[in-house]
Regions:
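N-terminal cysteine/histidine-rich coordination modules
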Residues: 1-70
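A sequence-composition feature that detects small, non-aromatic residues
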Residues: 28, 35-36, 51, 56-58, ...
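Long, charge-rich boundary regions
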Residues: 43-118
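C-terminal, charged low-complexity interaction regions
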Residues: 109-182
Length: 182
């Protein structure tokens, strides 16, 4: 699996939940989920994820690309693939849509909350994979709780990520680079 360069992941966009590659802008993204019935015949919605809207990933040669294949999902458990363009979840109207989904419990609560953070909170997506290491190294101590970070904490993590040494960088090079970049 190709790893996204650190500077690219910090800049902007979202990581595709299917292929792991960059979804560079709102128009390139799609949010989808699966609707089916549970064993008692009650509606069950699951599998909320942010993926590439069109087949842009070399890892997914199928026509559906990173998106769920509706035929496969129906065969598995008579599931129906539902979704909306990523831009529907952005901005004030997108926040209202996400809040309505939370209020109506249309989708699993934790999945909707995580999507809201990814789309609505500046820097959250870029900092997400870095936060665990940043907390363990004392870069931040979350004021609210794990998974819920203030903007100052997110920006501290992103600044730290730009200056932290890689396995190939000596401590002296790291210190010099950080001094220059401030």
């Amino acid at each position: 699996m190709r790893v996204m360069p650190r500077d690219k992941s910090i800049r902007s966009g979202w990581r595709c939940d299917s292929c792991g590659q960059l979804v560079p802008d709102l128009q390139a993204g799609w949010v989808e989920w699966l609707a089916a019935e549970d064993t008692r015949g009650k509606p069950k919605v699951s599998g909320l994820r942010l993926v590439h809207h069109r087949n842009t990933s070399a890892r997914s040669p199928e026509s559906y690309g990173c998106r769920y294949n509706p035929r496969d999902e129906f065969r598995k458990n008579r599931g129906i693939v539902e979704g909306l363009a990523l831009d529907r979840f952005a901005g004030p109207d997108g926040l209202m849509l996400l809040l309505s989904m939370i209020a109506e419990r249309e989708l699993p609560l934790q999945e909707v909350i995580e999507l809201a953070k990814r789309v609505q909170i500046p820097g959250y997506e870029a900092a997400y994979e870095l936060v665990h290491d940043a907390v363990s190294q004392g870069v931040i101590a979350p004021c609210i709780s794990s998974g819920f970070y203030l903007q100052c904490e997110i920006w501290d993590v992103l600044k730290w990520a730009k200056c932290r040494p890689s396995a190939k960088t000596s401590q002296v090079e790291h210190q010099n680079r950080c001094v220059v970049s401030h």
